UniProtKB/Swiss-Prot annotation:
Pfam families: Ribonuclease_P. Consists of a catalytic RNA component (M1 or rnpB) and a protein subunit. InterPro entries: Ribosomal_Su5_D2-typ_SF, Ribsml_uS5_D2-typ_fold_subgr, RNase_P, RNase_P_CS. RNaseP catalyzes the removal of the 5'-leader sequence from pre-tRNA to produce the mature 5'-terminus. It can also cleave other RNA substrates such as 4.5S RNA. The protein component plays an auxiliary but essential role in vivo by binding to the 5'-leader sequence and broadening the substrate specificity of the ribozyme. Keywords: Endonuclease, Hydrolase, Nuclease, RNA-binding, tRNA processing. PROSITE patterns: RIBONUCLEASE_P. GO terms for cellular component: ribonuclease P complex. The keyword Signal does not apply. It is an enzyme of class 3 (hydrolase). This is Ribonuclease P protein component. Gene3D superfamilies: 3.30.230.10. Its EC number is 3.1.26.5.
Length: 125
């Protein structure tokens, strides 16, 4: 489970991230990111916060919950590498229902990398 300080809970936070943030689409998900320091809020401190949107288009409840659990597990590993004060909303597309956890993680990391929220992985030995 994602710790409470790293969860997006309020509808207004989701809306601000989706409407005012940057967006990067991948095959099975769309990543929205918003830097809280840009907002007129005093709540720009704290670690990154993650929110999930898994609609009925993904599939029945069992499948939607499975996709959400996979994405939450991936987000736990990203808490330490995404910059503090960043809100991230991950919107699952219908293809996420059949994608493996590894594919979802690769797509999420690629989206965050394109949004300049992750440092590129060095391939030097």
């Amino acid at each position: 489970m994602l710790p409470e300080p790293h969860r997006l809970r309020r509808h207004s936070d989701f809306s601000m991230t989706v409407r005012r943030g940057r967006r990067m689409g991948r095959r099975d998900l769309v990543v929205h990111a918003f830097d809280r320091a840009q907002a007129d809020e005093l709540v720009s401190s704290g670690g990154p916060r993650f929110g999930l949107v898994v609609s009925k288009a993904v599939g029945p409840a069992v499948i939607r919950h499975r996709v959400a659990r996979r994405l939450r597990h991936i987000c736990i590993d990203l808490v330490d590498v995404v910059p503090r004060g960043t809100d991230v909303v991950i919107r699952a597309l219908p293809g996420a229902a059949t994608a493996s956890s590894r594919d979802l993680e690769k797509q999420l990391r690629a989206g965050l990398l394109r949004l300049d929220l992750l440092a590129p992985v060095s391939t030097s030995a």
